[in-house]
Design a protein with these regions (language model features):
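Short, intrinsically disordered N-terminal pre-domain segments
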Residues: 1-15
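Solvent-exposed loop and capping/linker segments of extracellular ligand-binding repeat ectodomains
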Residues: 1, 17-19, 25-452
Length: 452
């Protein structure tokens, strides 16, 4: 154990602080002027999980779903002795009480599943708390740089900590499923996210990690190129001050990987590039839903789609003026469902070259796009169940449609597809008899252009 000794004349009210790697290990205030030697035991040269507050605060750790704190978990206040950490016990720190440090040797971190876990809470919402240190010092504080994190989870550890202003370091490159699930959910004072260097992800690893972090303005870099199911799902959901999105370099996606990732981020002005050409089920579902400051969409290069891949991707993006090209010729069920629903400033629709359709493929695709004046040509000869259902519903300025189907017998394929569009305009249809209609007439719903 290393010792630090300081000899000198200390003035009344003087404070001596010992910091290691910018982390305060211990501090001492002198009540009166004195000349003496003060010594500190530097057993804590490790970057323990450290909490700092300017005024008195309390920290309590609770457990859920039969979870039991690992016996190795300990805490120390103001550089004092290490004491075993117990659940439901309030620990006072901050201000004159000094910092609070945690350490442990728990291979599982603070959880064994997404529900069986420990959770930190602070007693005074009006006293802000800064957290620093390396989260791996809870896994093995003596060997934190080399310890395996293959089983370490910190699910919901800071859930609802509205007074938390900064996060600990999360340098692990080996992740396990649900490892950071909802870790900072509803941490409304968190302004900076930790670095996330992992390049290979695990199922649900970052799911809802920063959800409702309403003070977060910049997202961390996300260098991963190997994704996993739901890895980024809801990651920045409702981060209402987020202005900048990270680059997303992966070219092969996983089911639900970006689902709801930036849902209702109204200050996000630019979407990241999306280079992936191999898609997965619901991969981009609602990714930018409600991003009302988004004016341009990223390029979407995939030519073969997956089920629900673009479902509601830009729904409610009211300032989006131009849609990306959609070159895919091989569709999937619900692939474009509600993709631009409610995009009230969208003036031009992309070409839709596919001739073989799938159920619900264009379901409500342009629903409520009130600035749209012309529809893309719809070349498919045979329609399928619910394929064009409410596709242009409520597009009040739409006055030009070309739909070349010759078989419209599928269930619901044209239900309300042009309901609410302009009462007159240009409609172009196939020259041959349209199967499934009466006398070759195209059903319109309650209103619409067709006659043709």
């Amino acid at each position: 154990m290393a010792m630090l000794s300081l000899y000198g004349v200390f003035a009344e009210g003087a404070t001596v602080s010992v910091n290691v790697a910018n982390i305060e290990i211990v501090s001492h205030a002198f009540a009166s002027a004195t000349e003496e030697c003060v010594s500190y035991a530097l057993d804590a040269t490790y970057p323990y999980l450290t909490f700092t507050a300017d005024a008195a605060q309390t920290m309590t750790i609770n457990t859920y779903d039969s979870y039991v704190l690992d016996e190795s978990m300990q805490y120390s206040v103001n550089g004092g002795e290490w004491v075993q950490l117990t659940a439901k016990t309030a620990i006072t720190f901050g201000g004159d009480n000094g910092t609070l440090r945690l350490r442990g040797k728990s291979a599982n971190g603070t959880a064994t599943s997404s529900s069986s876990r420990a959770q930190i809470s602070f007693g005074d919402d009006n006293v802000q708390v800064a957290c620093s240190g390396d989260i791996r010092t809870l896994v093995d504080y003596e060997n934190y740089t080399t310890v395996s994190t293959a089983k370490a989870r910190f699910c919901k550890l800071f859930l609802g900590c509205g007074s938390l202003t900064s996060a600990p370091e999360l340098p692990a490159t080996t992740l396990t499923e649900y490892c950071y699930y909802m870790m900072f959910y509803n941490c409304t004072s968190l302004t900076v996210a930790p670095e996330l260097p992992a390049t290979t992800l695990a199922n649900d690893c970052y799911e809802s990690m920063f959800r409702l972090c309403t003070s977060l303005t910049v997202a961390p870099e996300l260098p991963a190129t190997t994704l996993a199911e739901s890895c980024y799902e809801c990651m920045f959901y409702d981060c209402t001050k987020l202005t900048t999105a990270p680059e997303l370099p992966a070219t092969t996606l996983a089911d639900f990987c970006y689902r709801f990732m930036f849902w209702n981020c109204p200050n996000l002005t630019m979407a990241p590039e999306l280079p992936a050409t191999t898609l997965a089920v619901s991969c981009y579902e609602s990714m930018f839903n409600g991003c009302t400051s988004l004016t341009a969409a990223p390029e979407l290069k995939a030519t073969t789609l997956a089920e629900s891949c673009y479902y509601q991707m830009f729904s409610g993006c009211t300032n989006l003026t131009a849609a990306p090209e959609l070159p895919a010729t091989i569709l999937a069920e619900s692939c474009y469902s509600q993709m631009f629903s409610g995009c009230t400033n969208l003036t031009a629709a992309p070409e839709l070259p596919a001739t073989t359709l799938f159920a619900n493929c264009y379901y409500k695709m342009f629903n409520g796009c009130t600035s749209l004046t012309a529809a893309p040509e719809l070349p498919a000869a045979t329609l399928v169940n619910w394929c064009y259902y409410r596709m242009f519903y409520g597009c009040t300025n739409l006055s030009n449609i070309t739909m070349l189907a010759t078989d419209i017998s599928a269930s619901g394929c044209l239900n309300d597809w042009v309901s609410g569009v302009a009462s007159s305009g240009t409609f172009t249809k196939a020259a041959s008899l349209i199967q499934g209609s009466e006398a070759g007439q195209i059903p319109t719903g309650t209103s619409g252009i067709p006659e043709g």
